[in-house]
Amino acid sequence: MWMPSLDLAGGLWARARRTLYTFFSRLSRYAQRFWLSRAYFPVLLTVAGAFMAAGQPVYGVVALGCIVIWLLAACPDLLAPVCPFFMAFLMSTQCYGQLSDFLPCAALVPPLVLALLWHFAVWPVTLRLGRSGMGLALVSIATLLGGCDVITRKQAVEPLSLYYTLGLGVGMLVLYVLFRSHLTEKRTYDLHRRFAGIFCALGMCMALAVLLAYLKAWLANGAVVGVLYLSYRNFATSVLLTALPMPFYLSLKHRGHLVTGGVMALALALTGSRSALLFGAVILALCGVYLMRHGVISRRCLTALAVAAGIAVLAAGPVVLQW
């Protein structure tokens, strides 16, 4: 006869299920606490910044990838893994043009897919294709087929080419469907402020990459003359311009976010992009008006900042024209 503890009907199997359920419940509880805690964004920025400072972006992507898998599998909120997921892509700028260095990270793809399937098995949602779905589908097709009559097959399958064609095409469509379906659920937090926090953290991650490039050049040469050439400056400019308004929105409740806006603006200027200066100045001016209308700063303070910015532009004009 079987021992009672090995009885699959009510013994061993029931205990195993209870143990697994208890373990997953704790894992899920810790994931939700981390996602909703104040430590969420600082921890992610610390991980990304530490690995970028050490010059080990591949290991940083692995670390962030493990966090993504944990949050995806254990947290019911699909927004939780978004920030570390995109931070991993921002860290790849340190090997821009040499994305083959990240091929070992492909080992994270199977557990990532399994975590995604597990997430929708445990917390199922009804997929919804919103009004932008058809437009994004057409953009995805255009992205995949664009340049097919010009570039060679070898160029098309290069890691950097696949990164853009798949990421900006099919990847954006998949993300849109997932989040369009998921964001209809009720939440215990302000969704707008949480989105702003995610963009703010991504902007700070990109700013850290730019500032670390200058710090390493200064440590290597003892001084930094002019603006460094950054191979990823257009990419960095796009990320920073997108994220720049977010700290000003968050500063309505916490003035400390204005420092974050200043760091992003500094990194934007150091990218060496003329479009960064032009559009960055426009965004900062609009953000200043936004802060004034909400009583964060006075009209006199805004005028003083505008005059100081104008003097700085005139002083830096000759240098800017040389870029």
Show where each model-derived region lies.
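Alpha-helical transmembrane segments of multi-pass inner-membrane proteins
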Residues: I67, G171-V174, D190-N221, L230-H294, ...
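Juxtamembrane "helix-exit" motif on the non-cytosolic side of transmembrane helices
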Residues: T93-G97, G147-A156, Y214-A220
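Transmembrane signal-anchor helices characteristic of membrane glycosylation enzymes that use polyprenol
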Residues: A53, A207, A308-Q322
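Hydrophobic membrane-targeting signal helices
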Residues: V113-L116, S140-G147, L211, G288-L291, ...
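Hydrophobic alpha-helical membrane-embedded or membrane-associated segments
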Residues: S37, T46, L138-I141, L168-M172, ...
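Aromatic-anchored transmembrane helix interface
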Residues: C105-L112, G133-G146, A156-R180, S238-V239
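Transmembrane signal-anchor hairpin modules in multi-pass inner-membrane enzymes, especially those
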Residues: M1-C148, T184-R193, L250-R255, I297-L305
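Membrane-interface micro-motifs in multi-pass membrane enzymes
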Residues: A54-Y59, Q98-A107, Y164-T165, G226-T242, ...
